């Protein structure tokens, strides 16, 4: 009888502990690398195209033939208020914010905030859901990123595809963030 009472108290203690346990929200990340996972790219970083300001999935983010350079990112969490993904060059200079440009087959690029309005791009709505980069399209979280072939081996352009439309790339990709230590 005493063991049943003890067991009941133990379960009650465990149940109350679970009920009052505070969940820790997943925070954003700073100084993170965005890596891409897809059919032809596993853990390839996203690089910046110095010629056009667009983002590329590259086996080598410093690919000089494609004129690419690596970036680090400051990324908000979906529980945060500022859903903007800001990029920084390796030398510490701000590159700008991630944007989607409808006029360029929904290419994804980086520009300073002041210039994004002139190219009619979408800059807000990018955040992390756990470690995956998503886009908030009117309260729907979407991850519709695609890789598009380029003329360089091991380099794909990063694009966005709207719901119910023909994909604007060769294969879908998932983008995940990892913080550098």
Predicted segments, located by residue:
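Aromatic-enriched hydrophobic runs in primary sequence
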Residues: 3, 95-97, 126-127, 145
């Amino acid at each position: 009888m005493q063991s049943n009472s003890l067991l009941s108290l133990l379960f009650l203690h465990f149940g109350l502990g679970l009920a009052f346990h505070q969940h820790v929200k997943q925070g954003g990340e700073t100084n993170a690398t965005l890596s891409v996972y897809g059919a032809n790219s596993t853990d390839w970083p996203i690089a910046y195209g110095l010629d056009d300001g667009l983002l590329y999935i590259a086996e080598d983010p410093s690919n000089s033939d494609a004129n690419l350079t690596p970036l680090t990112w400051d990324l908000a969490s979906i529980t945060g208020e500022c859903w903007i993904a800001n990029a920084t060059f390796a030398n510490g200079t701000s590159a700008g914010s991630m944007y989607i440009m409808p006029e360029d087959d929904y290419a994804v690029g980086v520009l300073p905030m002041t210039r994004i309005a002139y190219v009619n791009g979408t800059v807000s709505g990018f955040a992390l859901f756990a470690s995956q980069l998503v886009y908030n399209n009117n309260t729907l979280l979407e991850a519709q990123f695609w890789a598009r072939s380029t003329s360089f081996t091991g380099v794909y352009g990063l694009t966005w595809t709207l719901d119910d439309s023909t994909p604007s790339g060769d294969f879908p990709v998932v983008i995940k963030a990892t913080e550098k230590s």
